[in-house]
Amino acid sequence: MAAWMPQNIQKRLLRYVLQQLSLFAEIDLPNLDVSLGTNSKVHLKELQLDPDKVDIPNFYLRNGVVDDMDLTLTLSNGVNIEATGVNLTLAPSMTNGVDFDPGKLSFSLYQSTADLATSVFFVDQDNNELPKTDKELDDEHDSSKNVANDDDSSPLADKENPKQPSKMGNMMAKAVEMALSRLQVQLKDINLTIITDESTFQICIEEASFDTTDGVRKIEFKGAELSVLKPSVYPGDQPQGESQDDSEDDDSVDESSSFDSHPTDFMSSSFIGSREELENSMLNSQSSVYMSATSKLLTKPKHSTRHPSETKPSVTLGHVNEGTLTFEGLQSFENVSIIIDQIHVAVSPIPESLTALLETLSKRLKILRVHSAKSKPSTTTTYTFSSKDGLQEEPEFSDQISTSSSTGFKELKINEIVISLNSALGKNGAFAIDNSLCLSIESLELAMVSEGNLSGTLKTLKMNKSETSEVFSFQPGSNYDVRFEMILDDDNDLYNITILCPKPGVFNLNEEVLNHLLSFCSKIPSTLHSLQSYQYQKAKLASLSNPQSNSNNDQENEIYLQTASFEFILQLTSSDKVKLTSFPLSFNSNTGVIEVERIVVERKFKENQVQGDPPSQDRFKMQPHKSTNSGCLTCRKRQVKCDERKPFCLNCEKSEQKCTGFTHLSKDLPSSSSSLSSDDSYKSILLINGLKTYLFKKPKKVKTFDKSGIQCSYLSPNASEIELIELEMTMSDFTSLIDSLELFFEQLKVVNHPKMDIAKEKTVFRTSFNSRNPVRNPRALGSQTGAMFSHSSLVSFLRINSVSFLLKEALNGFGDVSGRIKSINCNFHVKGFQDFFVGSLDVARIHKLSSQLILEKVDAPGNKKPMLIARLKSSSLTIQLADCLAHYYGEWFSFLHQCNMKEREIVKRQEDIGPKDRARDSNNFVISLHLNNIIIELNPVSLKSKAVLFIKKGCGTVTFGSQRLSISSSLTEITPLLIDDTKNLKNEIKLDSKNSHPLGNSFLLLLMDMGYISMGMLSSVSVSFETESSASLIAPVNVNVMCDTLRLDICADSLQCLLNLIKDLRQPIIVPFEQKYRTQPETPLDALKDVDFDAFLPQKTKDSNNVAATKTRTFSETALNGAFRPKVYSDGSLEIIDNYYEHESVNQGLDNRTYGDLEVFEENSEDDISLENSLNMKHDHFYHTSFMDNTRNTEHVPFKLNLSVEAVYIRLFDGYDWKETRVSILNAVRRVEAKAAAELSRIEKIRNTKLRRDSSASNSGNEGSLQTDDDSATSGSVSEPVIEETLYQSIHLSLPVGMEPTLLAERVNNDVNFKRASSDSLDKTQSPSSVSSKSQVSSPQTRRLKLKRSTFHKVALELRNLSITFKLLSSFDPTTIKNKSSIRNPNSAEIVNRISVEVDDFLITDNIPTSIWKTFVTYLKEAGSRELNSKMVHLDIATIRPTRLLATTEMRIETNVLPLRLYVDQDTLDFLTRFGEFKDLRFVPQVVDDDDLFVSKLHVFPVRLKLDYKPKTVDYAGIRSGKTSEFMNFFILDEASIGLRKGWTWIGGLNNQVNSHTKREYGTPDITRNQLKGVLSGLASINSVVKISSGFKDLIAIPMEEYRRDGRLITGVRKGAFSFAKTTGNELLKLGVKLVAGTQTILENTEQVLGGEGNLARMPVQVKERKQRRDSDEGNFYVITDRQTYERNLKKTSMNESIIGKTSLREANRFDEEYDDDDDDEDDLVNKIKPHLRNTMLDSQLFLDDNEIEDEXRGARRPDESQKTISLYANQPTTMKEGLQLAYQSFGRNIDSAKRAISKASSKVSEDNRTSNIAYEVMKATPVVVLRPIIGTTEAVSKALLGGLNQFDPDNRSKSEDKYKQ
């Protein structure tokens, strides 16, 4: 046939055949080479595909070029097509992407094959004709097209001839099948380029073939490769020396040259302008950038033969070496089988490439959605099949195509998949690095078991770094590693996917592996963000085209996952491994629950085995079990073995879980515990039991707390819950684990890959992603998840029910630390911060079968707030701690000390090794702490007492920096409380509704109800802490403590308890005596070896005995003997005695001795000091030079403490706080009273016997005899020892024999209440006969004791601006040094620490009721005005170690005090003495230091004192016993001047062991020599005489001084006269005031004795009324101090059952001190309430019987302490005029008193006219009537004189205001 066909006819025929394939555009005849025959061959060049005739789903064909194409037509083999250089350019199609029809893919293939069959087989319906000419063929072709068009336009023709197309369809199907069976296609060098706005991908296939055998289509390909051209991404790790960018072109080389294989005139073809799809793709003007970019991609310069990938480097993503695709059928695919040999994937560039692609698709979807919304109704283009496309009308075949859209999948097999996490992928699929981290998958098979049922297996899944280094692998076995199946649900067309991992897996992780994994994971969030945005835009577009699609989208495929156990082994160091074992995991997407039965963390530390620790039994391991179910995969019953011996371990119950989704897998999950590696060297440290994670389809509400701790609900897309977490390990292992983790994470750094040069890119890929906020756009997760990102939404929620931990051997000998945390809620907010809430936290110490609480929660009624609230942000952590009780025990101090010593050794070793460079974070991490209702309990070592610090509110900040750690805190109020014995506590620290207080300070009131005593208050406390390093315990530390107000309210017993408790808060460190003092020298020492005994002897001819005596004189004799002084003769010469130079040398040696570098200053001894001269203010008073300033400067200060208190108030109360103290005093009084009563009975018995014996005697004789006996008894009572007993070394109970026993209780009360008048009687000797018979009956009123704390304080100490500075200058401890030779300068001294105390103002206030003076100690104003910034008290204390080898230390003290003014009342002095001497052996620690602090030197700088002393009683018994100090009570001192000599220094010991006599001997010479004159001048009897005589002296001395100086006699006389007048006038006026005041006092006392008011007449009216009301017997008066009793009494309806007192409730003022009413003993109330209430209130009493309770309850009511004794010198008038006015008022007031007395007596006389009554009333009124006018006169004269005195000397009034109570 080919012989007679012309060449042009052959070409036209072949062109027609090719055009009928619907694949190619117009074919140019010059590029067509035809050779026809039996083996016809057609060769085509640069053949272009027609984009309009190629329809690929979701893509547009932009360009298609085939470089060379050969078609071979044979009669036997059919058609063979061979093509080389197939280049296709695609772009995503948004319109087809909306409504994707799977049938279009099949139809396009059918259309091409049908056209081929039409071209090959010329079917004629009428007859067979020969082929027509070229022109005829063309005309027929055109006519056939028209007919086809007409048929398309006439639908009636289809209906009229329904059967004819069926016949033609069957014939056409056979023709297509025949054509395909003889068609063979082979393609080489296939390049498929997919271009988008911001990314370009390329698929290269080396070779692909298509053939059909027995109806089975087979497609084979080799060398398929996927690469990315744009953007520039990191390809992965490459061998060193190779550049990541192989392009060497400059910026002038445009990237358009990479596609130069395309024709130059391609843009002018009909491809651009004729296609409607191109216009649809360019919906908005924003896409013009894309067209300008792609236009260059599609152009090609002429004569270019380079491959598209040769000019621009591409990054390979994946490579497939070979694969085969087989299927059957044409319009519907059946038995599709895919077999792939090997796939290599490089993961490193995938995230960035995929992110760029998803960003582009999301942007284009958004544009399409906007365009579709504007052009409603939708104009989405659909494919229309017509005859012009070359398809004949075949209705039956068309229906078959449209309905057959499903494909028949058979199997998928992949032999191997290798995914590299870090290596780049080179050519031919080879990885650039051989030992890269790769994930390998072998033998992946997926098969269709039945219709809608897919089953797959994965034989091997592992991850390795090399052939020998496995990172992850499953346990070897015959089973597959992974099995899965997919079951189609016909009802909703969804799949039930089941995934099963039946074999245990093991992960081996190290630093390098984690670096690669973290590097890859760091890129995932941005890709997920882009994917979420794409899904959101796609869902929005779908909902726009089909609004009902949202309801269908709610249904998703169900996924069921079940795994065996997994082990994660983390290699921290070469010797430290941590293994995490996750027991079976299950997941059900239907319920959204991920459940892990248990997670166990174990550790393997080689050093543990070296130390000999036996491997511990793992109490977290699970027991193996055998499976019994063979058809269904279920979770078996598993039981957790718990060690019941552990205090915190919970008994875990059995749990059974069933998964309903695993129904078609034939094999069971084996026992996970039996499959795990059984390495006994691992030790279990952590258990996580019952982990569940809930993934909600829609956000749900979870109950949690807000930032204030109030319960609320949040929306969360997921929630997790952990039932139990247990931690158990030793503290050493814990610290070593922390160190290993710290070192590991310091070395663990995410690899920062080098950024590619994207300057050449014209479109830069931009993406913003915040790892802490993965979704910035709330709508990025779809319409359903967008609602959760509101102000009350969470990203995730976690709840932990219980956490238990046990840290063994926390410190050396400390024991174990156990704790439990309950109800932990974790809120992970959308904004990136996290909130943590802890319901309760309990921590305890376990040591030797005993436990000690460390931290616990205090429950309050109705308080459901969590104990701890924490909020974690990027660089800050905020913690709120409330209702917490912390415990401290004194024995812990030794453990902390040992820990500090170990830290020092470690630091020393590190210093020897050298500094270790570690990368430090330059950013600071801040922890903010807020405290509310915090109780700190202080437990001493040996004492039974306990202290509590109650912190109401506080806040603090901790800042961790790279080189420093700083802590600052502020506490609003701290209340210290104290209890003497813990057994006296009434109940536990637990609040409930029964004993809760309605007041705000419920915790504080609760503590006081339990038995604690409030000791004061600290307000506005600020603490700051700074150190140079946060990683070391011995780094230099600087602590600053500031407090606004410190108030301390104490009694004598509570003060001693407090001081000893503070001392007992640390366990004393006992150092052996030999080690402390080193009494035995290492080498023999001859102290007198080099001593020249004759060096200082002036005459060697002296008597040898004197020389010997001088040599043997001891140091103490020389230093303390004041007789060694040179004798001064009258002519001024000195007698040189033998011991003079010896004495001087000794003193010089003492004063100038040095301790190494420590220099002691030299004394300036000046014997005499003039006290008459005024005080000369020196500017350098406080800037003296002392041994403190001459010490060497220490560059390194390990610790520095600065304490600053603005105001300090120490108030001393009388009475006793502790009940045991009061009971002891009561019992002692009873014992003395019993002895006195027995002696009194014996005396009465003797007296009665004598009376009966002498009954015959006369009355006078009897009286004389009785008087004699009484005298003898009296004399005997004086000579005999009195009945006495001493308590607490300060309370002396004594009663002379024969005295009334009841007087002892009265005296005790008077001593406490300062009633001197009635107590003086005990000082006198009385005989038993003087006691009347009525007095022998002890009334309850006289026997009651009042021993509780007084209502008002008696003495107050006030300090202003107290500053204490403590510097630790040396942290050297010689007890820890074993090698003495390593000590530097062992014989030199060093200063261990230094304390500096400064006080701006110092004041002691006298509040004793019987004292008329206001202050006790204050500043001496006569000394002049104080200098600016001068300190009233300055004290320097230095602790010195004499030599560095000694463990003992000594102290040196320097003190400076400004001039002081003292007003000493004997009552106040006795109170302070009794207060200070109190000592209770209960509060003495059992273990104390061997020696007290040794004060080697005390230096007191000159102090000027002015003293007023007012004695009241004289202890004659003390005088008789040799107490000579009682003689001072005979004299009153007024302005006595005392001055300590300059530079008073004590050298020697001042500890308790030093004899007090020695101390007095040292100071007595100075007092007798220098101070006696000032003391005698201050005697009140001669003070005025001395001052008047000094005025006469000035009258003579001043003129003489003036005349001697300048010769002016008259001026001197005038000055002398003025001084004389002023001095004499003042003293005369003062003397007159004293005489008048003395007279008034005598008269008032006389009146009071005779029944008048006395000095009460001068008291305010309110005080008198209060006293009269309390003394009246009209009704009972009660003061209730117990709130419970008060609340019970309020419920009583009858006032007769309980009479509430006339005062307000004491609880409301329990912190106030100024009460208007008495502090009645609460035990006095006990007798007035019901017995059962009394037993309830006194359940903690120490008495043994009820009688003793009642005896103490009959305590006498205190006198009115608010009644002050007002002096006649108080309230002085300012001027003479005011004095006269006050004189007139006082005289009138006294006259009125006399009138009232007369009128009162007259009215009573008129009522009763009896003579006796008249006489009684007259006698009662006479003293008042007679004495009151005289008292008024004296008072008036006194006021007038005081007015004149103050006007003449205004300073006198200011002195009186400071001295007297007003």
UniProtKB/Swiss-Prot annotation:
Record field: catalytic activity: a 1,2-diacyl-sn-glycero-3-phosphocholine(in) = a 1,2-diacyl-sn-glycero-3-phosphocholine(out); a 1,2-diacyl-sn-glycero-3-phospho-L-serine(in) = a 1,2-diacyl-sn-glycero-3-phospho-L-serine(out); a 1,2-diacyl-sn-glycero-3-phosphoethanolamine(in) = a 1,2-diacyl-sn-glycero-3-phosphoethanolamine(out)
Species for this entry: Komagataella pastoris (Yeast)
Region named Disordered: 130-167, 230-266, 298-317, 1251-1278, 1317-1344
Composition skew (Low complexity), residue ranges: 1324-1342
Domain-related comment: The C-terminus (1237-1862) is required for the location to the perivacuolar compartment. The absence of either ATG1, ATG18, ATG9 or VPS15 also prevents the correct location.
Protein name per the record: Autophagy-related protein 2
Main location group: other
Xref: PANTHER family: AUTOPHAGY-RELATED 2, ISOFORM A (PTHR13190:SF1)
Family: Belongs to the ATG2 family.
Function, in words: Lipid transfer protein required for autophagosome completion and peroxisome degradation. Tethers the edge of the isolation membrane (IM) to the endoplasmic reticulum (ER) and mediates direct lipid transfer from ER to IM for IM expansion. ATG2 binds to the ER exit site (ERES), which is the membrane source for autophagosome formation, using basic residues in its N-terminal region (NR) and to the expanding edge of the IM through its C-terminal region. The latter binding is assisted by an ATG18-PtdIns3P interaction.
Residue spans of biased composition, Polar residues class: 1256-1278
Molecular function per GO: DNA binding; DNA-binding transcription factor activity, RNA polymerase II-specific; phosphatidylinositol-3-phosphate binding; protein-membrane adaptor activity; zinc ion binding
